[in-house]
Amino acid sequence: AEPLASQLKEPIAGGGWWAA
């Protein structure tokens, strides 16, 4: 849940693209 690739695998844990 750090790089973009991790956010694609675990977006909830990364709180990344979908939350933006």
Curated annotation (Swiss-Prot):
This is Protease inhibitor. The keyword Nucleus does not apply. Optimum pH is 4.5-9.0. High activity is also seen over the range pH 2.0-4.5. Activity decreases with increasing pH above pH 9.0. It comes from Antheraea mylitta. Disulfide bonds: none annotated. Stored in epidermis and secreted into the hemolymph and cuticle. Not detected in the interior of the epidermis, fat body cells or columnar or goblet cells of the midgut epithelium (at protein level). It comes from the Eukaryota. Monomer. Keywords: Glycoprotein, Protease inhibitor, Serine protease inhibitor. GO terms for molecular function: serine-type endopeptidase inhibitor activity. Glycosylated. The keyword Repeat does not apply.
